[in-house]
Amino acid sequence: ANPDLEVMVAGGDGDGYSIGAGHFVHAARRNVDMSYVVMDNRIYGLTKGQASPTSREDFETSTTPDGTNQTPVNPLALALSSGATFIGQTFSSDAQSHAEVVRKAIEHDGFGFVNVYSPCVTFNDVDTYDYFRDSIVDIGETDHDPTDRDAAIERVTEGGTEYTGVIYQDPDSVPYEQREGIESNMAEIPDGAPEDAMDLVREFY
């Protein structure tokens, strides 16, 4: 509504990749100029530890005692296949790197998505801080080119590697608002309906 504001949305893996997945996909597809940061702890922490869309297939909880028996959602692959023009991943324990990736997402012209590994110390004893510290690979220390979409696809579909850093960024991204010529500040539109619209209301009521 106000093109002068930076729009940031924060959520979790439970809502973002489940009931809110449709909003995520279409915001990415349209390339809306906003940043979306998801705290991914691979569990529903606030509702006492049920499996989330990113929980491991064999992850046992009170509601899935035999595991989920479902392939977990791959957030980076979902974002990439939906058309996101900036995709990053960070670890909540590495504040400096996290802040840098989020800054780049905010500065990006278009939809900036950051998935954040945020271990739940209460209900998830598998995907722990120690697990991520041992498993994470900083993609910036590899030969990865974040502007190469095919390379990004290859990285996000690799099994067993937990990458952090900027996975993909389209240098030619044109945000939805610019592409569609949306320039007006809706906050400056006068209140109230036009008089001709009110005439229609009076005619039927």
Describe each model-derived feature in a short phrase:
Residues 19-23, 29, 46-51, 124-129, ...:
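Short acidic, glycine/serine/threonine-rich loops at helix termini
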Residues 50-57, 95, 102-111, 125-138, ...:
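Short, surface-exposed, charged loop/turn segments at secondary-structure junctions
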Residues 35-38, 88, 115:
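Short hydrophobic alpha-helical runs that function as membrane-insertion/retention elements
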Residues 9-11, 86-91, 113:
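Short catalytic-loop micro-motif centered on adjacent basic/acidic residues
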Residues 120-205:
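Flexible, low-complexity linker and terminal segments
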Residues 1-45, 100:
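Thiamine diphosphate
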Residues 45, 96-98, 114, 121-126, ...:
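Short acidic/glycine-rich loop or secondary-structure boundary segments that cap or lie
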Residues 4, 52-105:
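Conserved thiamine diphosphate
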